[in-house]
Amino acid sequence: MTPRKTVVPPRTALVIGAGMTGLATAWFLQEAGVEVTVVDRRQVAAGASWGNAGWLSPALAVPLPEPGALRLGLRTLLSPASPLYIPPRADPRLARFLLSFSRNCTPRRWQVAMSALAPLNRQALAAYDELARGGVAEPTRASYPCLIAFTTEAARQPFVHELEAVRAAGQSVDYDLLSGAEARDQEPALSERTGAAVRLHGQRFLNPGAYVAALADAVRERGGKVVEGLRVTRVQDHGSEVAVVGSDGTDVRADVAVLANGAWLNRLAAPFGVRAAVQSGRGYSFTLPAEGLPTGPTYFAAQRVVCTPLGADRVRVAGMMEFTAPDRPADPRRVQAVVDAARPMLPGADFSRRSDEWAGPRPCTADGLPLVGPTRSPRVHVCGGHGMWGIALGPLSGKLLAESIVTGRSAAELTPLHPLR
C-alpha cells in the first residue's frame, strides 16, 4: 500500500454515475460504513453498462491500443463497415486522442500497460464473489464452453500469441486449441467457415443490465440513495465538503465525491487536474432468439463480434468500436455491420428478428488503462476509463478505490492508474 496524508474517513459520499463502476464503488464504500448517494444523468445502467456483451473474461482484458490497430489503414478506419470506425468530421479533441492512442500502439507500451492490468485481472472475479456474498442477487455464470472462433489456424495465431503475452505479464491463462471440427462439435451453431478455435477456461459472464440493476438494489437495501435523471453540471470543492450541482439547480453535498460518469468524465474531472482524455468508444448490440445461436459465450475475433446467452431463450450479439462523441445518435449502419460480420459465421441465426438494438459509449483512454484514484482535491476521486473492461474490472476498481478513500492508503495496483498521470 502507498501511504497518503492521514485522512479522517468520510461519513458521506456522492457517486456520479450509476453504471457498474459507480455502483460498485458505492457498495464497497457502504461496506466501510459510509453513507452514499448515487446520481445519474439518466438511469441505472444507462451508459455503457446495459447492452454490452457481459463477459467477465480476465484472459481477454488487454490494453485497447495494440500494435495491430495501426495496420488497419485510414481507408478502413473511415468505413462504417469496419470493426474500428472513426466517423469523418472535424473534431480537434478526437484528433488529439487518436494521436496519443497511436503513440501507445507499440509492443513496448502494450507490455507496460498489460503489466499494470495483470494484477487487476487476477483479482477481478474475487470481487464479484464478494458482492455475491454481500447480497447482490443476480448471479454470474461460468463460461463453458467459451470459444474464440477463427476461419483458419493462421488467423488464430496472433490471438494465441496475445494470450501468451498475457501469461508472460504474470496472469494465469488456461486454454485449449481446437480444430474447426472440434469447435463445431462443441458448438453446433458455428458454420463450416470455422476452421480453428481457442477454448478458454476459468471465465464467466453475466446479463449486464440485470446485474447492474441488482447492484443498485443492493445499494438501496443498505440505505443508500440512487437518484436518476439528475444531470450534474459541476462539482465544487468547498474545503470541508463537496457540492454536486445539477442542471436544475439541485445542490447535493457530501464529504467526498466519486466521478464515475463514464465517457462524460472529463467534463467534471478536468477542473481537478485530470488531463488524461476519456474518449467514447461506442459499441453496438442487439438481441436475438436463441435458436441457431451459440449456447455458450462465443467470440469471432476477426469480425469483432461476441455472442452472449441471456437466459435460455435469448442471445445478445455485440461488437464494433466507434470513436465518436458520446451523445451522437446511433448509426444504423453499425448495427448492419455487426449483422454482416456475424451472418457468415452463424448460418442458423435469424437476424431479421432483432430486438433491443443498443449503442453504448465505452469510456476509453489513450494508454488503455483506467483512471482510478484521487484528483488534485483530496475530496474528489475518479473511477472510470475502463474501455471494454468496465464490467469485468468495475467491481475490483470500486473496491480498491473505496479502500483508498476510507483509509487514505492506495493499493499498489492503483499506482499506474492514477488519474493525474
Residue ranges: model-predicted function:
Residues 11-38:
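N-terminal Rossmann-like FAD-binding beta1-loop-alpha1 element of flavoenzymes
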Residues 19-20, 43, 263, 388:
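Residue-level detector of alpha-helix initiation sites
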Residues 31-51:
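Glycine-rich FAD pyrophosphate-binding loop
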Residues 52-55, 60, 64-104, 234-242, ...:
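Active-site substrate-recognition segment that forms the wall
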Residues 95-214:
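Rossmann-like flavin
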Residues 177-182, 186, 204, 225-242:
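A conserved short coil-to-beta-strand element within the FAD-binding core of flavoproteins
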Residues 302, 346-421:
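C-terminal catalytic lobe of FAD-dependent flavoproteins
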